[in-house]
Regions:
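Glycine-rich phosphate-binding loops of nucleotide-dependent enzymes
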Residues: 1-162
Length: 162
């Protein structure tokens, strides 16, 4: 999450404070460099000293995601990362996730946006009533397969219906 009344910069450096301090003292030049780098990568324009709550929901989402990148995580676990964001911001988030995965890292994505899953994922696990309804490989992923599995429709049940 974000600390909405705090600045964009404060939110971006919060998870990295331990790495940006030495002997209990904050390294302001390192903090400023990190903020400038992340703001550039996120395409956040304007003053990073303004409150994060002044950003659009999509830009807030980019800050919430990007603040973890300096920690060099091997896994990102995301829940509906593009819900409620505009198309351009969604594209930027997709680019960030693809770049992360291209570095050999794992992105685990829970999403109610079926086209997003088709567009981003190389594997999809569909849950229905708390159980795995389908595990789809890249060549099996389609909106129909995902929705069908979520609704309990399988090849066997389709044959019974015919």
């Amino acid at each position: 999450g974000l600390v909405l009344p705090h600045s964009i910069a404060s939110n971006l450096i919060l998870p990295s404070l331990g790495r940006l301090a030495s002997k209990g003292l904050r390294d302001r030049p390192a903090e400023n460099g990190l903020v400038a780098d992340l703001a550039r990568r996120l395409t956040i324009k304007g003053d990073t000293a303004r409150p994060v709550q002044a950003l659009s929901g999509g830009n807030q989402q980019k800050v919430a995601l990007a603040k973890w990148l300096p920690l060099d995580p091997s896994v990102l676990l995301l829940n509906d990362p593009t819900r409620g964001v505009d198309i351009e911001t969604k594209r930027e988030i997709y680019l960030m996730l693809r770049a992360f995965a291209a570095e050999g890292r794992l992105v685990i994505l829970a999403s109610s946006d079926t086209p997003e899953l088709v567009h981003l994922c190389d594997r999809v696990v569909v849950l229905r009533e708390g159980r795995v309804a389908a595990a789809l490989s890249q060549d099996e992923i389609s909106e129909g397969a995902i929705v069908g599995a979520a609704m309990g429709i399988t090849a066997a049940t389709q044959g019974e219906a015919a």
